[in-house]
Amino acid sequence: AAVLALVLLLCAFLPHAHAAALKEKNGIRLLSFDTSHILSIGNQTSGKCSLYALRYARTILDGKVCSGSGMWSNGAVWSAAGYVGYSGTRAECLKKLYSELSAGRPVIVHLKNTTVSGVKRHTNRTSTYEYHLTGSGWDEVNYPHIATSSTYGHWVCVAGISPTADPENLTESDFYALDPARVTANGRLAVTRLLDNTLWVENSPLKVLG
């Protein structure tokens, strides 16, 4: 009995993640989180998109700002945040992404450049549209985020789904992310719509909660 009581006492002090509710927010089904928490973390410092994506994810799960302590060692320490890798075909990864979000769990996604036609600048990019939260809804802004390199790509925290997404016919553009490159713009929350054919299927495409 004494041992059981000690175990229960120790467990009481362990961090407990909770699933975040997926709710419609001005036309985007977004995991619930305190906007001020994400804004306080802000945009990434150079080369640390993976760490910042992890911090956003843990902040959503824990309901408090994640400092990122112990989650970086010349690269993101996924296990320190309770995340593990998931690989598969593009269709399998997108289905996993959908199911994780539906269960209230943010997913870290690895992006690569894709070539976009019909644009004058930055034909190779990881995204095109971002949405700034205002008092009256989302302002759509054309702001291409360029992957830092073809070697490392770019990591984002996916936290939203289009309300029109078909679970049996998913594409990257059905999902919305907290992008470490621009999670805040002029003091407002910004979410980025993923661009089709940017999921880096061949190179650690997803990190999911273990």
Q: Model-flagged regions — what are they?
A:
Residues 92-178:
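Active-site-adjacent substructure of cysteine-protease-like catalytic cores
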Residues 3-12:
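Bacterial N-terminal signal peptides
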Residues 21-27, 83, 87, 106, ...:
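Post-signal peptide N-terminal regions of Sec-secreted extracellular proteins
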Residues 44-47, 56, 72, 89, ...:
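Solvent-exposed loop/turn segments at secondary-structure junctions
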Residues 156-159, 173-210:
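Aromatic- and glycine-rich peptidoglycan recognition patches
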Residues 14-79, 133-148, 170-172, 185, ...:
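Active-site-adjacent structural segments surrounding the nucleophilic cysteine of cysteine proteases
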Residues 70-96, 101:
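Substrate-binding cleft of extracellular glycoside hydrolase catalytic domains
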